[in-house]
C-alpha cells in the first residue's frame, strides 16, 4: 500500500525524503514554504535534483505539494484573487521542477459572494493557470466552516466538470466527516464512498489525506486526531483503508504529533489495520 506523511523541508527539500524514510512512509506531501505567508518556493536546482534522486533511489512517491493556506480561489476580492493565482502558478511550476505530479489546493471561501459565485470564481482562477503537462491540480475536500466551499461532493464535481483543466480530487477523511459524510462504521464508509463515486467519480480520486477527527460528524470542525483514536474510530478507519476503491490510492497523513505519537506511529497503525482487517 502507499502510505506516508506530510514532511518538513527544513534544511532543504531533499530532507523530506529522509524524514519519510525515518517514519516508514513510501509517499508523502510537502509545503514548498511556510503556508502562512505569501512566499516564493525558491527551490534551487541542486536541491531539486537531490530530492528527485533520493525519491527515485528509495522508491518514495508520489509526492504532493500542498498550496499555501492563504490561497483563496473563491474570493470576490481582486487583490486576493491575483495573489492566489500567482501563488498557485509558482506551486505548479515547483512541482514540475521537483517531478512531483500533484499540487493540492482548497477551493477557499466565498466570503459573502454566495456559493455559485464562489465556485465560478474558483473555476476562472484555476483556468488562468498554465499547468505543466506533468502536473495535476487536486481539489481538496473541505470541512466547510464559515463560507468555505468544497465541503459538498457536488462542489468538487462542478469545478471538475466546468474547468478547462483536467483536475482531480484529494479526499480528506477528517474534512469529509466534519462536513457530514459519516465514515465511522463499515456501512457508513460504503455509503459515503458510493455517494462520492456517484457524484464525483472514484476515477477522479488521486490522493487521500488520511486523518481521524477530534470532532463529531457534521460539526464542520477541522481538527485531526490519531488514526483510530478520534470520532471516526478504528472500525471506520479500518473499513475505509481496506475498501476496494481506496486500496490503490496514496494515503497521506496529517495527524498530530502529541501524546508521544507522531507520523511513525500513525503510519504503523495504518499498515496494521490494512494487514489485519477485522
UniProtKB/Swiss-Prot annotation:
| Top EC class for this record | hydrolase
Q: Which domain of life is it from?
A: Archaea
Q: Name one GO molecular function term.
A: DNA-(apurinic or apyrimidinic site) endonuclease activity
Q: Where does Zn(2+) 2 bind?
A: 140, 172, 209, 254
> Which GO biological process entries does UniProt record here?
base-excision repair
Q: How is the cofactor bound?
A: Binds 3 Zn(2+) ions.
Reported cofactor(s)? Zn(2+)
Q: Which Gene3D superfamilies match?
A: Divalent-metal-dependent TIM barrel enzymes
What InterPro entries does its record include? AP_endonuc_2 (IPR001719), AP_endonuc_F2_Zn_BS (IPR018246), Xyl_isomerase-like_sf (IPR036237), Xyl_isomerase-like_TIM-brl (IPR013022)
Q: Which UniProt keywords apply?
A: DNA damage, DNA repair, Endonuclease, Hydrolase, Metal-binding, Nuclease, Zinc
Q: Name one Pfam family in it.
A: AP_endonuc_2
Q: Which residues bind Zn(2+) 3?
A: 175, 222, 224
Residues given in the record as Zn(2+) 1 binding sites: 66, 106, 140
Mind telling me which residue stretches traverse the membrane in this protein? none
HAMAP family from the UniProt entry: Nfo (MF_00152)
Biological role stated in the UniProt entry = Endonuclease IV plays a role in DNA repair. It cleaves phosphodiester bonds at apurinic or apyrimidinic (AP) sites, generating a 3'-hydroxyl group and a 5'-terminal sugar phosphate.
Family stated for the protein in its record: Belongs to the AP endonuclease 2 family.
**Can you say what this protein is called?**
Probable endonuclease 4
